[in-house]
Amino acid sequence: MRPQLKKISIHFMVFLLTCVNLVIYLPKEVHASTVELKGLGNISHYNAVVFGNHSAIGGDIEGAIAIQGDMDASGYTVVGAATGGGNIVGERWIDEGYPSLLLSGKMKKSRGESFIVQHGIVVMTKEADLNNILQSYNRIVYKEKSEIDAKFNEFRNIVDQVNRDASQCKTNNPVPKMSYGIGEDMKNPNIYVSSEMTGKSSLEVRDVYLPNVDNKDFIVMYSDATEIAFKNGSILYDTNNVGTATDVVQTSQPYNPHSPFNKLYEKVIWAFPNAKKITTDGYGVVGSVFAPNAVLEAKGGSINGQIFVGELHQRGGFEGHNFQLNWKNWNKHGTGKVKIKKVDTKNIDKRLAGAKFNIVDGNEKVVEKLETDEKGEAISKDLPIGEYKIV
């Protein structure tokens, strides 16, 4: 049988060997509505990706959320920014045919308060909501758990690669009056990077002074600490590029498309590859957090960017505000590889050798031909970032 076309994205250095761990078999799909699901979305689609369990009492996530473990939320709203209301801090969420909630585990509800999916398509397994928590929501698409988990594996590889790349950024020229020895990366002057957040098992983040980023691509805040706390402080920004960060970034004000702070939300990266526990206590974190091994205990405050964590527990009205990392800039110098794994349709543990595939680019040009080896695997050469199909 001719394999179905598969569309993939190559992200920088990617996920190399991961960008697709394609298992060539067709999962069953059941639609509970006539809504057209275009796919499970790429990593830039999600406001939060949780590789374990998620719980919430109050608060919300303004954008889409993906949860690989179980979800237990009360008094909570998903894609709150879909309303476009005046109280939304992040960018408005628009339904483009990708999940507003992607759930691989079970849906639970240990308290009586409401749980609201404001808009969009919920994607989960048929066993996820046995208690009918979403019984009145008719925009649900059911997928096999293996297909959903494959998407999380893709995301995890991307997040790990971001952390590896962040660890390679170094500076020996800190900018005066800025926090944590932030200075230009020695290899890429378009990136600022911290130099005083490593070598500690625990790290407390209080007031943070950030340099102007009008002519920079990113600020990388990298720490190898295992325990991190955001508390008793604010993030201040050198808005006018005068050499002093005096403007407090207002992380609770309604979204303003002309705010000078918007560029910060897409350019600041908090890279915590070794973190096991992160706490926020009423703190407005600016930028995206990459901590796939950490349990994030968020008590009030917000994260104004994407959230990539092992577990997420929201209390005290904590909110995820709908801002995304500028992935296009982060990936612009990257390449990646594609790995294909061919398995038997009736026994996914049986790998098949000799299967032939073509990798086709966006111009419908065959850029490489692959054949699986005795392990049922084939790996492409380095490919530029872009959209590809496997035929």
Residue ranges and their predicted role:
Residues P3-Q4, N132-I182:
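Secretory-pathway luminal glycosyltransferase catalytic domains
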Residues Q4-K28:
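Sec-dependent N-terminal signal peptides of Gram-positive bacterial secreted proteins and lipoproteins
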Residues K7, L130-I133, E144, I148, ...:
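Solvent-exposed loop/turn and edge beta-strand elements of beta-rich ligand-binding domains
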Residues H31-A32, F357:
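N-terminal, intrinsically disordered, polar/charged segments of Gram-positive cell-envelope systems
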Residues M71, L101, V122, I191-Y192, ...:
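Hydrophobic beta-strand residues in large extracellular and virion-surface proteins
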